[in-house]
Amino acid sequence: MICSIGAVSATDLNDNSTVEVTSSVDDSISVDEASIIDVGQNQEVASTSAATWDELKTACQSSGDKVITLTGQSYNANSQIVFGNSATIIGSSDTYITTNNPNLIPFFNSNSNLNITFLNVNFKDSNCKIFIQSAGNNELNNCIFSNITTGAGKTSVVYNTQGLMNLDNCTFTNCHTQYGTITNYGSNVRMNVDNCNFVNNTSSNIGGAICIDSKNTTVANCNFTNNLANLNQGNAIEVRAFGANITG
């Protein structure tokens, strides 16, 4: 089943809820690749490339802001990247990041002054605690997350903590989590989810696709297909904070 969410208030949303259908979508969902990103022309940013996970880790943790182009094919996240600069990571349809460590958070940022961007990055076939957990200002554009399982507790594929996170034109498919594929949690968090697709995702607890635990959340122009929360609390979206905006 496919539904487009439009003009609803803060409450639990299920894939089989009655909602205003604003547009129809095909069974096959494609994401156009973007080729241009504004990384801040008024600041000096070094460009580099990374062919392996270790090279990516070195670039992300070093001083000085970086634009990092992924030039390898498969990146095995066998350790944690703790961001040390405002990094922009640029992938392509030929590259992907994967991991098999249920206790690992491959990408982590607790510095509220950093700006982290993922552009055209594919994350797939993984078992981890959380894939991306970040404070600061975060942009995820044209990224694909597929076949990802997260660990026990309040875990998600993408977890926003004490910062601003914008997700645009991203796709989440066949992900199994505890707390939604995306979670916006905390008193000082803001999240905007626009033009994203959520297909065949499941949660052992709540929020099959998205768990909203902050009123500073906007979900717009997103499509939800066959998502499931085992506790039947928000098969598509679990809203736990009044004031969140969900529009078509």
Please name every model-derived segment.
Residues 51-54, 65-87, 94-95, 101, ...:
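N-terminal extracellular ligand-recognition/capping segment immediately after the signal peptide
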Residues 86-130, 141-149:
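Right-handed parallel beta-helix/beta-spiral solenoid domain characteristic of secreted/periplasmic
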Residues 14-74:
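Acidic Gly/Asp/Thr-rich repetitive segments characteristic of extracellular carbohydrate-active
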Residues 89-91, 113-120, 138-145, 165-168, ...:
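All-beta strand scaffolds that present successive hydrophobic residues in beta-strands
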Residues 50, 54, 71, 90, ...:
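Serine/threonine-rich, low-complexity intrinsically disordered segments
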Residues 59-65, 69, 82-84, 109-112, ...:
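Flexible, charged surface loops at secondary-structure boundaries
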Residues 80, 101-109, 125-135, 149-162, ...:
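Extracellular beta-strand/beta-solenoid scaffold signature
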